[in-house]
Amino acid sequence: MTDTSDSQDAVTVERTFDAPVDLIWQMWTEPQHFAAWYGPDGATIPVAKMDVRVGGTRLISMRVQTPNGAMQMWFVGEYREVVDNKRLVYTESMSDEKGNMLSPADMGMPPGHPATTEVRVELEDVGGRTKMVMTHVGIPADSSGGAGWAMAFDKLAARVSAHTNT
């Protein structure tokens, strides 16, 4: 089940996965897993550097195809809260490949897109399955953020299914 709701300043997606909490946690916190599902359809993640601890940094590169060819975007952030198998909170800002923050306007984002957003992931064991609630705070309601996350979580569900059926 997917419930995507947009408000003025947050996108929230709730999903239940047929997998244990520790596997979903690994998908969020281990670079090789994260890179396999993150981003909308067609996106690849050539770089996922993740120091998953409070105060640790993350540097993610997303490559997408556009009508004008391939485009590579970089995101930098910091982990604010890490509670194993329960809660993950990190910031996210557009950056260059060295992790220097860039203006959203310089990256072609619409007016009002914040320089720094916050991603909150809550995981709950529901009889061996995992209920996940992800809130991306700071994403404007009229952005494509909700659709992008929904596509990413479809990819996550496929990866989890493949992982649990091996």
Language-model segments: which ranges?
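Hydrophobic ligand-binding cavity/cleft-lining segments
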Residues: M1-I45
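Basic/polar N-terminal segments that are highly enriched at the extreme N-terminus
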Residues: M1-Q8, A158-T166
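A generic structural micro-feature
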Residues: S5-S7, V52, G69-M73, P111-A115, ...
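Intrinsic-disorder/low-complexity, polar/charged segments enriched in Ser/Thr/Lys/Arg/Asp/Glu/Gln
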Residues: Q8-E14, V21, T57, W74, ...
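Short beta-edge strand/loop motif at the mouth of beta-sheet-based domains
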Residues: T12, Q32-W74, T166
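Hydrophobic pocket/interface hotspot
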Residues: I24, F34, R58, Y79, ...
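Short, charged/polar surface micro-motifs in flexible loops or helix N-caps
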Residues: E30-F34, G55-T57, Q65-P67, E81-L88, ...
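Beta-strand/loop substructures that line and gate deep hydrophobic ligand-binding cavities in soluble
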Residues: E81, K86-A150
